């Protein structure tokens, strides 16, 4: 009820202004009596995945807390894991505004943010100060002005800086809002990137005395053959997990709706079915060789269960959280 009232107010604002205000309020309320608006005690539903123990299988997807400013607040909401980022080596402003749009009747969002963030060093400082009990994932990407042929270097820089502080590292090569980025999902480019990341992981594991798993985040806009090739690369390079999926460029199910024509990636309920199909295809290809984190339209217990039945061990929410609030996390965890 409280969130429904808050949402009514937030939805009167421009989508990005509402997002920024929510982040500021989470920072302001954290550790004060006002955090009772979102703090919740949830039952333990432990899951072993990628060598880590998650207190429950429901996580916050990357993109909501790009700079790691609200880890403690999201931890207080009961998430089993929180993924911050996407973060890049250098700060960058992202794409021109407006760049975030609600498709309310479809419970969807279109964004063309463009990896706006304050840089990896800023994020690391925030992570070092935060106190939390959930697993922390850090999602890494490349700067817009880094040529795609040099993209691996950006991922390696970020990986080196976040390794010591991450529970796992998510490698984002599937955002549609950085020109050329999705080309890293294919063929030799993917193999070379994963090989370099794996070598860096071994080097950092020895240096820090701990193994931090790597998960690759992929797009929903892939053919079955492309998914099969990605799976071959994941297995060949001993990657620890795969996150499926990012946002879609497809507008078929929202055609004619307000804002549906806007450029960018579409998330929420409109991508639910396709992302679940990608999870199912990944599971058919991978079996138990590596775990799948399912994300895309997880807006209810039923949607979460469908992802798990398709083969996901963990699920993440983002757009569903915008529309339904912390109660969504509670409903999924309690019904598992």
Curated annotation (Swiss-Prot):
Which of this chain's residues are annotated to bind FMN?
A: 62-66, 86, 139, 172, 217, 245, 268, 297, 318-319
InterPro entries in the record:
Aldolase_TIM (IPR013785), DHO_dehydrogenase (IPR050074), Dihydroorotate_DH_1_2 (IPR012135), Dihydroorotate_DH_2 (IPR005719), Dihydroorotate_DH_cat (IPR005720), Dihydroorotate_DH_CS (IPR001295)
Q: Which cellular compartments is it found in?
A: Cell membrane
What does the entry comment about cofactor binding?
Binds 1 FMN per subunit.
Keyword set includes Flavoprotein: yes
Q: Which Gene3D superfamilies match?
A: Aldolase class I
CC terms in the record's Gene Ontology section:
cytoplasm; plasma membrane
Binding positions for substrate per the UniProt entry: 66, 111-115, 172, 177, 246-247
Cofactor(s) in the UniProt record: FMN
Q: Which reactions appear under catalytic activity for this entry? A: (S)-dihydroorotate + a quinone = orotate + a quinol
Q: In which pathway does it act?
A: Pyrimidine metabolism; UMP biosynthesis via de novo pathway; orotate from (S)-dihydroorotate (quinone route): step 1/1
Q: Please, which domain of life does this record's source organism belong to?
A: Bacteria
| The EC number(s) this enzyme carries | 1.3.5.2
Q: Which GO terms describe its biological process?
A: 'de novo' pyrimidine nucleobase biosynthetic process; 'de novo' UMP biosynthetic process
PROSITE patterns given in the database record: DHODEHASE_1, DHODEHASE_2
Q: What are the protein's UniProt keywords?
A: Cell membrane, Flavoprotein, FMN, Membrane, Oxidoreductase, Pyrimidine biosynthesis
Query: Has UniProt tagged this entry with the keyword Glycoprotein?
Result: no
Gene Ontology terms for molecular function? dihydroorotate dehydrogenase (quinone) activity
Q: Which family does it belong to?
A: Belongs to the dihydroorotate dehydrogenase family. Type 2 subfamily.
NCBIfam families the record matches? PRK05286.1-1 (NF003644), PRK05286.1-2 (NF003645), PRK05286.1-4 (NF003646), PRK05286.2-5 (NF003652), pyrD_sub2 (TIGR01036)
Its recorded name reads Dihydroorotate dehydrogenase (quinone)
Q: Which organism is it from?
A: Vibrio campbellii (strain ATCC BAA-1116)
Q: What is the lineage of its organism?
A: Bacteria, Pseudomonadati, Pseudomonadota, Gammaproteobacteria, Vibrionales
* Gene name in the database record: pyrD
């Amino acid at each position: 009820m409280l969130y429904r009232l808050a949402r009514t107010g937030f939805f009167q604002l421009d989508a990005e202004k509402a997002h920024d205000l929510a982040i500021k309020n989470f920072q302001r309320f954290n550790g004060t009596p006002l955090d009772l608006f979102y703090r919740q005690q949830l039952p333990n539903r432990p899951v072993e995945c990628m060598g880590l123990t998650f207190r429950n299988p429901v996580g916050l997807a990357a993109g909501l807390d790009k700079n790691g400013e609200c880890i403690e607040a999201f931890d207080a909401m009961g998430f089993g894991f929180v993924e911050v980022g996407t973060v890049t080596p250098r700060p960058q402003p992202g794409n021109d505004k407006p760049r975030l749009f609600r498709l309310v009747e479809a419970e969807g969002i279109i964004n063309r943010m463009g990896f706006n963030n304050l840089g990896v060093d800023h994020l690391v400082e925030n992570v070092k100060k935060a106190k939390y009990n959930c697993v922390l994932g850090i999602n890494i990407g490349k700067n817009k002005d880094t040529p795609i042929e040099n993209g691996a270097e950006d991922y390696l820089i970020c990986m080196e800086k976040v390794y010591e502080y991450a529970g796992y590292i998510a490698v984002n090569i599937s955002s549609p809002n950085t020109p050329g980025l999705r080309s890293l999902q294919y063929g030799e480019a993917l193999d070379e990137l994963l090989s370099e990341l794996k070598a860096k992981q071994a080097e950092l594991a020895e240096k820090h005395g701990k193994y931090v798993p790597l998960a690759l985040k992929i797009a929903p806009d892939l053919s079955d053959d492309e998914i099969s090739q990605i799976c071959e690369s994941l297995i060949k390079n001993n990657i620890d997990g795969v996150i499926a999926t990012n946002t879609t460029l497809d507008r078929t199910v929202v055609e004619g709706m307000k804002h549906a024509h806007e450029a960018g990636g579409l998330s929420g309920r409109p991508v639910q079915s396709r992302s679940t199909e990608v999870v199912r295809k990944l599971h058919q290809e991978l079996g138990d060789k590596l775990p799948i984190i399912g994300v895309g339209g997880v807006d209810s217990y039923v949607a979460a269960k469908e992802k798990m039945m398709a083969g996901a061990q963990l699920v993440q929410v983002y757009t569903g959280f915008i529309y339904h609030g912390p109660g969504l996390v509670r409903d999924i965890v309690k019904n598992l």
